[in-house]
């Protein structure tokens, strides 16, 4: 396949896997926080604060994956090499 097509596929699959992992992690965190609050309603403030901090950390994974995918798509260091190879093949 062409280099840029492979870059688009890699970015798409990378973002899909990153979003899937982030969604599973956030779902499990919220599930456990809700279970903790249902067992001990008095500790809901500490549990919810800790959950929010944890969710922010988990969400940072999706942001990092997005940044890497954008780098693959728009600031790829091998773009010039691929263009030169394509020109050589065309000649």
Swiss-Prot record:
Localization annotation: Cell inner membrane
GO biological process terms held by the UniProt record: proton motive force-driven ATP synthesis
GO molecular function: lipid binding; proton-transporting ATP synthase activity, rotational mechanism
Keyword Transmembrane: yes
Cellular component terms per the entry's GO annotation: plasma membrane; proton-transporting ATP synthase complex; proton-transporting two-sector ATPase complex, proton-transporting domain
Matching Pfam families: ATP-synt_C
Residues at the site labelled Reversibly protonated during proton transport: 59
Cited InterPro entries: ATP_synth_csu_bac/chlpt, ATP_synth_F0_csu, ATP_synth_F0_csu_DDCD_BS, ATPase_proteolipid_c-like_dom, F/V-ATP_Csub_sf
Keywords, sorted A to Z: ATP synthesis, Cell inner membrane, Cell membrane, CF(0), Hydrogen ion transport, Ion transport, Lipid-binding, Membrane, Transmembrane, Transmembrane helix, Transport
The keyword Cell division appears for this protein: no
Subunit structure, interactors included: F-type ATPases have 2 components, F(1) - the catalytic core - and F(0) - the membrane proton channel. F(1) has five subunits: alpha(3), beta(3), gamma(1), delta(1), epsilon(1). F(0) has three main subunits: a(1), b(2) and c(10-14). The alpha and beta chains form an alternating ring which encloses part of the gamma chain. F(1) is attached to F(0) by a central stalk formed by the gamma and epsilon chains, while a peripheral stalk is formed by the delta and b chains.
Role, per record: F(1)F(0) ATP synthase produces ATP from ADP in the presence of a proton or sodium gradient. F-type ATPases consist of two structural domains, F(1) containing the extramembraneous catalytic core and F(0) containing the membrane proton channel, linked together by a central stalk and a peripheral stalk. During catalysis, ATP synthesis in the catalytic domain of F(1) is coupled via a rotary mechanism of the central stalk subunits to proton translocation.
Protein name: ATP synthase subunit c
Gene name tied to this protein: atpE
């Amino acid at each position: 396949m062409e280099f840029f097509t492979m870059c688009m596929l890699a970015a798409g699959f990378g973002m899909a896997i990153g979003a899937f992992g982030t969604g599973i992690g956030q779902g499990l965190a919220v599930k456990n926080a809700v279970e903790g609050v249902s067992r001990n309603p008095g500790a809901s403030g500490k549990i919810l604060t800790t959950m929010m901090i944890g969710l922010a950390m988990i969400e940072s994974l999706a942001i990092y994956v997005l940044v890497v995918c954008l780098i693959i798509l728009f600031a790829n260091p091998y773009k010039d090499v691929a263009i030169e190879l394509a020109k050589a093949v065309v000649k």
